[in-house]
């Protein structure tokens, strides 16, 4: 029988690091069977939110596990190395917390892959476009511009894409990713040079993706979708217009083509839609059925998993890669539609408007990477869920354009708050397996947001800030209000102070499209 600890007793397993700023260490014994420690990166204010969640659960256990328990349960999975890592935007999710990073040794035959460590919206991620426009150039036509974007980019649950696509096209999308969108005219050839993995995972195999998943994905190419992730509470999906408010690192920003306060940028956040959700759901069924056969013990049934080299593990990784390719194409088509919207309203070509991709990052993905573990270079399967790769300067897997500055990291804020561009660091490789935060992280559930926040008050606050808004559903106004989230600036500053990413640019929203 598992021993039950009081809240005060559980705190004895958590200590603050003397060596690394904003690091809390969760020692073995916090939950049963931990193979490694849990490492939480959070300042005192952000950590208090997670401790309060833990206390609430201890006093009154509910249907969800607090993020700290989930972090520790991941530390008990077979084959995990270094530590189970939670970033400052961590909050409770399905199996893994959102904001969790975990790596498994590819040379260990017991190591596992878990769909809960990626999430249901496989390769949900963010793409940033820059322009040569200043805010004064679009201010008189801002409403027209945001309406054109809203008209061209399908948003919301069940929305249908405008790109003609048959099952043959879909298989090519799943296999070739952005190479398909370049050949089909929906991407500029240079776009993929500024995408993580250059917009394609070569392990993808369309034949392992179920007919049901393909049917769901066929009509959703180039759609923004909605932000309700099954079994989890994540940031909503959006396409926002920003202006540069502050530049912290002028050299790095200039390399990215961002060099002026007031410069207009566009950020799109979306993923693999219903197709990725179905790939994850199918894999969970397979893995739940095989858990007894493989004799893998997990602390939480939501951590259903399979050995990496098992049939179930290989199938999931191939399907996840295919869904990731789909997500890159999805963001590419939305980039195409965004460029088209600007062209139609401003009567200039996207090329003349300098609408180049700054970068495209993944927030929910599993990848094979090489990292140092106990002084040895090891090949690992990295699970990043609600977290962002943050490789340092001169890392071989980042684009040539960014070798001197490190990988750009895109961190989205909420409906009325700023977003950030960061750069990766060597310390991230040492402390967080080359990872940093991805957003702000929810503090209120969607239901609670609708109960306690006033629709008109939220709209008025946005209006006072000069933010235009279009939403697929009115309920999103309260669900996605800034009050529902942690302070993204505090999250970003915590990562900056810990040295796992470096602040580069701050972006202020002037128009918001929510799905």
From Swiss-Prot:
Residues annotated to bind Mn(2+) 1: 121, 124, 229
EC number: 6.5.1.8
One CC-aspect GO term: tRNA-splicing ligase complex
Entries under Gene3D superfamilies matching the protein: tRNA-splicing ligase RtcB
Pfam families for the chain: RtcB
Co-factor binding details: Binds 2 manganese ions per subunit.
Residues annotated as the enzyme's active site: 438 (gmp-histidine intermediate)
Substrates-to-products reaction catalysed: a 3'-end 3'-phospho-ribonucleotide-RNA + a 5'-end dephospho-ribonucleoside-RNA + GTP = a ribonucleotidyl-ribonucleotide-RNA + GMP + diphosphate; a 3'-end 2',3'-cyclophospho-ribonucleotide-RNA + a 5'-end dephospho-ribonucleoside-RNA + GTP + H2O = a ribonucleotidyl-ribonucleotide-RNA + GMP + diphosphate + H(+)
UniProt-listed SUPFAM superfamilies: Hypothetical protein PH1602
Obligatory cofactor(s): Mn(2+)
Binding positions (Mn(2+) 2): 124, 269, 363
Keywords: GTP-binding, Ligase, Manganese, Metal-binding, Nucleotide-binding, tRNA processing
Keyword GTP-binding: yes
Subunit structure, as described in the record: Catalytic component of the tRNA-splicing ligase complex.
HAMAP family with a match to the protein in the record: RtcB_euk
Family indicated by similarity: Belongs to the RtcB family.
General function of this protein: Catalytic subunit of the tRNA-splicing ligase complex that acts by directly joining spliced tRNA halves to mature-sized tRNAs by incorporating the precursor-derived splice junction phosphate into the mature tRNA as a canonical 3',5'-phosphodiester. May act as an RNA ligase with broad substrate specificity, and may function toward other RNAs.
Protein name: RNA-splicing ligase RtcB homolog
Organism of provenance: Theileria annulata
């Amino acid at each position: 029988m598992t021993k039950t600890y009081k809240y005060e007793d559980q705190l004895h397993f958590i200590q603050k690091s003397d060596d690394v700023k904003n690091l809390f260490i969760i020692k073995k014994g916090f939950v049963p069977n931990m193979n490694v420690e849990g490492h939480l990166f959070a300042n005192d204010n952000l950590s208090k939110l997670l401790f309060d969640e833990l206390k609430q659960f201890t006093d009154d256990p509910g249907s969800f596990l607090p993020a700290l328990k989930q972090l520790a349960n991941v530390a008990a999975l077979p084959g995990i190395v270094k530590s189970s890592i939670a970033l400052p935007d961590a909050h409770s999710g399905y199996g893994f917390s959102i904001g969790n990073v975990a790596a498994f040794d590819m040379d260990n035959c017991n190591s596992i892959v878990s769909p809960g460590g990626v999430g249901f919206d496989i390769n949900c991620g963010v793409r940033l476009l820059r322009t040569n426009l200043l805010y004064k150039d679009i201010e008189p036509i801002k409403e027209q511009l945001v309406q054109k974007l809203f008209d061209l980019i399908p948003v919301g649950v069940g929305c249908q894409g405008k790109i003609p696509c048959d099952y043959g096209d879909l298989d090519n999308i799943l296999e070739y990713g952005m190479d398909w969108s370049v050949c089909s005219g929906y991407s500029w050839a240079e776009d993929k040079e500024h995408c993580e993995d250059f917009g394609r995972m070569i392990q993808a195999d369309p034949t392992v993706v179920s007919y049901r998943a393909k049917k769901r994905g066929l009509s959703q190419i180039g759609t923004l979708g909605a932000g309700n992730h099954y079994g989890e509470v994540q940031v909503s999906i959006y396409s926002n217009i920003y202006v540069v408010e502050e530049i912290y690192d002028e050299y790095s920003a200039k390399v990215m083509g961002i060099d002026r306060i007031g410069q207009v940028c566009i950020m799109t956040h979306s993923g693999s839609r219903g197709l990725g959700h179905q790939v994850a759901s199918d894999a969970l069924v397979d893995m739940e059925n095989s858990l007894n056969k493989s004799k893998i013990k997990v602390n939480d049934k939501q951590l259903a998993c399979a050995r990496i080299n098992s049939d179930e593990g290989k199938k999931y990784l191939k399907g996840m890669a295919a869904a990731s390719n789909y997500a890159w194409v999805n963001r590419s088509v939305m980039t195409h539609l965004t460029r088209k919207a600007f062209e139609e309203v401003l009567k200039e070509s996207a090329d003349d408007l300098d609408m180049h991709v700054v970068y495209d990052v993944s927030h929910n993905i599993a990848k094979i990477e090489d990292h140092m573990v106990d002084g040895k270079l090891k090949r690992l399967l990295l699970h990043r869920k609600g977290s962002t790769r943050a490789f340092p300067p001169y890392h071989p897997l980042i684009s040539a354009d960014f070798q001197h500055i490190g990988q750009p990291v895109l961190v989205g804020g909420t409906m009325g708050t700023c977003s950030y561009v960061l750069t990766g660091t060597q310390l991230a490789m040492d402390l967080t397996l080359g990872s940093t935060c991805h957003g702000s992280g929810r503090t209120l559930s969607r239901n609670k947001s609708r109960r306690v926040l006033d629709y008109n008050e939220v709209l008025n606050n946005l209006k006072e800030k000069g933010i235009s808004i279009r939403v697929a559903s009115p309920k999103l106004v309260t669900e996605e209000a800034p009050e529902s989230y942690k302070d993204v600036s505090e999250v970003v500053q915590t990562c900056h102070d810990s040295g796992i990413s470096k602040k580069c640019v701050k972006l202020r929203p002037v128009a918001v499209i929510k799905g």
